Amino acid sequence: MLDKSRLRIAMQKSGRLSEDSQELLARCGIKINLQQQRLIAFAENMPIDILRVRDDDIPGLVMDGVVDLGIIGENVLEEELLSRRAQGENPRYFTLRRLDFGTCHLSLAAPLDYNYTGVECLQNARIATSYPHLLKRYLDQKKILFKSCLLNGSVEVAPRAGLADAICDLVSTGATLEANGLREVEIIYRSKACLIQRDGEMPADKQQLIEKLLTRIQGVIQARESKYIMLHAPSAKLEEVIALLPGAERPTILPLVGDQNRVAMHMVSSETLFWETMEKLKALGASSILVLPIEKMME
């Protein structure tokens, strides 16, 4: 039995979001021994339990109050939400924040030889999908009548097997579509991973732990999106150099021994530093330019 006084977090056991979810928790300082076959893991240094389940079970576990938090793809969350509403339920939960992984989109795809000129071409078509409610919402908005063929896997083989005229499936790179003689024709939903919380009263100690976790997640994401920049620059060009490196705060400026015309500059830049930016810095007289990753960050 799970101890209800501990924070319960559901995450995908295996699949697209599993490794990224594990890495996020680890970088937040949560020490968990995640053995391959164990469905429940206990944090060693915080009152947190991890439930490792199928991704399509996570929204229901949160909405039904079985767990406190869930890490889930927005596509799976939205499909479950629409499914429950279709059954007359009023599911409740909170989205605490989007995360910086799990990027994908749900798309309509058709065979390469399908004469597709617009979504109107799918009028009365048979479409295979694992996301019938998201598909229905999109095509209802377009006033397109269609027949749904529900498949829980290998959706991309449906046209070749004669089960459907087209498909609606998740796309990350498009390689799977291409391998099955399909092409993407419409994007109907864009998705990332998100962190959700159950509705209802939360004990104060749990809520404090959630706030601490959110602060750490923010720090992890900021660190991933930021770089620590060190360089030498002409004193007369400081503002021009700073303009090329947008950051959270003003840079640290240090004098260079034996050089009155140049300074050392240290700063955190909130944007990816491209080669073109470094070339512009060089053109302004900057030198010894170092771009370093940041492991942790808290403003």
Curated annotation (Swiss-Prot):
Similarity annotation: Belongs to the ATP phosphoribosyltransferase family. Long subfamily.
Natural source organism: Photorhabdus laumondii subsp. laumondii (strain DSM 15139 / CIP 105565 / TT01) (Photorhabdus luminescens subsp. laumondii)
Pathway: Amino-acid biosynthesis; L-histidine biosynthesis; L-histidine from 5-phospho-alpha-D-ribose 1-diphosphate: step 1/9
MF-aspect GO terms: ATP binding; ATP phosphoribosyltransferase activity; magnesium ion binding
Highest rank taxon of the organism: Bacteria
Phylogenetic lineage: Bacteria, Pseudomonadati, Pseudomonadota, Gammaproteobacteria, Enterobacterales
Keyword check for Thylakoid: no
Described purpose of this protein according to its UniProt entry: Catalyzes the condensation of ATP and 5-phosphoribose 1-diphosphate to form N'-(5'-phosphoribosyl)-ATP (PR-ATP). Has a crucial role in the pathway because the rate of histidine biosynthesis seems to be controlled primarily by regulation of HisG enzymatic activity.
Catalysis: reaction(s): 1-(5-phospho-beta-D-ribosyl)-ATP + diphosphate = 5-phospho-alpha-D-ribose 1-diphosphate + ATP
Pfam families in alphabetical order: HisG, HisG_C
GO BP, sorted A to Z: L-histidine biosynthetic process
UniProt protein name: ATP phosphoribosyltransferase
